[in-house]
Design a protein with these regions (language model features):
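Transmembrane alpha-helix segments characteristic
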Residues: 5, 104, 179-183, 257-281
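Specific aromatic-rich, kink-prone transmembrane helix
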Residues: 33, 82, 103, 122-146, ...
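Short acidic/glycine- and proline-prone juxtamembrane loop motifs at membrane-interface regions
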Residues: 44, 112-122, 287-288
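Transmembrane-helix motifs of polytopic, lipid-linked glycan transferases
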Residues: 70-92, 125, 129, 249-255
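Hydrophobic/aromatic-rich transmembrane helices and adjacent perimembrane loops
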Residues: 120, 152, 158, 244, ...
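Perimembrane helix-loop-helix junctions
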Residues: 158-185, 254-257
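Membrane-lumen/periplasm interface segments of multi-pass, membrane-embedded glycan/lipid transferases
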Residues: 196-254, 277-280
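Membrane-embedded, lumen/periplasm-facing catalytic core of multi-pass transferases
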Residues: 314-382
């Protein structure tokens, strides 16, 4: 029954239109046809295994955008069964299969990852698979999946810490564990080397510095981003998230007090805490998908608290939440906003999807990061696209704001502010926009 539900879920997501809604997804699509980190095809660190997967799919579909989205969908469709199997193995309770499976499937994060066109879903599947293989003592498979995790999404190196520790702790099997990791790593290094050579490492240093100091929006560089994380936790995990975090932190004490037969070492809780700190200080709170690792592992660990009589209650709740997540297929907010902007705007100022909008629309697009250029474009009648409501002080005239709702709660929505000026001679908005466009072109 769970397998049939999983197939229905997969079929539902396949009905959504293929659409790239971020610069990162566009970069991956470019990488399908030409790989170069220096050309942002894709951006650093290159994600070699994800490029291999998308190129393999592209042999069948001959459409880079579709190949990228299907690769994300394929990996994300494995998250629910792998998380459920890991919970069953860790807690030695087969009855946890249905509640964990349904709960992960019902998370707004799961379809968001599936349709993102990014490497998060496949990398998380490799991560859960490596942890599960270690519990089953399939050491070589665990090493292979861990190597693929790092090749799919090298920025997930923090996720590799626990499986690496557990694998190296296995006496007599370390070579079988390390060899696949080394082979995948060497193959990945040769792949990026043949494209960019030594310049790859220079780009890596530049990109990493920029992520943590300038445009990455991380709390490591901007302490106020921790408040943004609090809002993101509220939106994605309900305001009860402090209780959930507290429960995870006291998990080792609970196991000891109950003499749980399948008690986990405190290392698992410590590992989850490390992932939490890495998320808070190294990731962007504007992208809720960065909560996926701690959310998935948190569900697996908290499953042990679930009383046996409550398992089917959680399963039914998961089904109900899955019904709430269901929505009719439609393009993402970025695509909808771009279509309206092309009809109503002479130009556009935004900090989101700048490269995507420049390549997929005919509009002049100004990067909002450059304040002077943005102010000049806005003074000439450009529209403003933002993930936050646009204050009147940000615009040089009265505007009409349009809200584009996300398809899922973990996707970003967008605001588009369109100037509604009248010229002194009573000309229409359309004529004024045409005049503003002519001035900008000149």
């Amino acid at each position: 029954m769970l397998a049939l539900l999983q197939l229905a879920w997969l079929g539902w997501l396949l009905t959504f239109p293929v659409a790239l809604d971020s610069d990162d997804a566009l970069n991956f699509a470019h990488g399908v046809t030409r790989f170069s980190v220096l050309e942002f095809s894709p951006h650093f660190p290159g994600y070699p295994a994800f490029i291999w997967l998308t190129r393999l799919i592209n042999l069948a579909v001959d459409d880079p955008a579709r190949a990228v989205q299907w690769a994300s969908l394929l990996g994300s469709s494995l998250l629910a069964p792998l998380a459920a199997l890991l919970a069953v193995k860790l807690w030695q309770r087969p009855s946890l299969l249905a509640p964990v499976w349904l709960l992960v499937l019902a998370l707004p994060l799961t379809p968001t990852l599936a349709l993102s066109g990014l490497s998060d879903g496949p990398a998380l599947a490799a991560w859960l698979g490596s942890l599960l293989a270690l519990q089953q003592r399939r050491i070589a498979l665990a090493g292979l999946l861990l190597g693929l995790l790092l090749a799919l999404r090298p920025s997930y190196f923090v996720l590799a810490l626990l499986p690496l520790w557990l694998g190296l702790a296995q006496d007599g099997t370390r070579v079988r564990f390390v060899l696949p990791i080394a082979l995948v790593g060497l193959t990945s290094l040769l792949f990026v080397w043949q494209a960019d050579g030594w310049a790859y490492f220079s780009e890596g240093r530049r990109f990493t510095d920029g992520h943590f100091t300038l445009w990455g929006n991380t709390a490591a560089a901007h302490g106020d981003r921790l408040l943004s994380w609090a809002r993101t936790f509220d939106d994605q995990l309900t305001p009860l998230w402090p209780l959930l975090i507290g429960a995870l932190l006291v998990l080792p004490l609970w196991q000891r007090s109950k003499n749980h037969p399948a008690a986990l070492p405190p290392l698992w809780t410590l590992y989850w805490l490390v992932l939490l700190l890495w998320t808070l200080f190294g990731q962007n709170p504007d992208n809720p998908r960065h909560l996926a690792p701690i959310t998935l592992l948190g569900i697996v660990l908290l499953a042990g608290w679930l009383p046996r009589r409550g398992e089917w209650v959680v399963a039914v709740a998961g089904l109900l939440l899955l019904g709430v997540t269901f929505t009719l297929p439609r393009p993402p907010a970025m695509v909808q906003a771009a279509k309206l902007a092309e009809k109503a705007c002479p130009a556009l100022v935004t900090q989101w999807g700048v490269r995507l909008l420049r390549e997929t629309t005919a509009l002049p697009v100004t990067d909002g990061w450059y304040k002077g250029d943005a102010a000049l474009a806005l003074s000439q009648g450009a529209c403003r696209l933002s993930r936050r409501p646009i204050a009147a002080s940000e615009m040089s005239t009265v505007v009409r704001q349009h809200w584009f709702a996300p398809r899922f709660a973990a996707e970003p929505g967008l605001w588009l502010a369109i100037p509604s000026l009248q010229t002194p001679h009573g000309e229409s908005d359309k004529k004024h926009r045409k005049s503003a466009k002519n001035r900008q072109d000149n």
